[in-house]
UniProtKB/Swiss-Prot annotation:
This is UPF0298 protein LVIS_1401. HAMAP family: UPF0298 (MF_01126). It comes from Levilactobacillus brevis (strain ATCC 367 / BCRC 12310 / CIP 105137 / JCM 1170 / LMG 11437 / NCIMB 947 / NCTC 947). Keywords: Cytoplasm. Its main location: cytoplasm. Belongs to the UPF0298 family.
Length: 95
């Protein structure tokens, strides 16, 4: 039996009140709670994101749910510095 890493994604849940944040533990792992801005960062399995987003939006204390875009962002930065140098040189030539 081989161990496989479960792909996970974060959901940012904006709430009207933080009194019900304990209820969000049913849906995933609560990683962070912002008291000032009233949002909760919740980690869930990636295959359950759409189903849980629908369930969370129907809760009375939830304003909106935003899925994190981190899985779609390219995290390899090879050649980024070279690209920035060439773009700044072309911008300087235009002026």
């Amino acid at each position: 039996m081989a161990f496989t890493i479960q792909p996970r994604q974060s959901l940012i849940v904006y709430t009207y009140s933080l009194k019900q944040t304990r209820q969000l533990k049913r849906y995933g792992t609560v990683m962070y709670v912002s008291k000032k801005m009233r949002y909760v960062v919740l980690y869930v399995n990636r295959e359950d994101v759409t189903k849980l987003t629908d369930q969370l939006t129907h809760l009375r204390f939830v304003k909106r749910v935003v899925a994190s875009s981190r899985p779609t962002i390219n995290e390899t930065f090879n050649g980024v510095a070279a690209e920035m140098v060439t773009t700044t040189e072309t911008e300087d030539d235009d002026e």
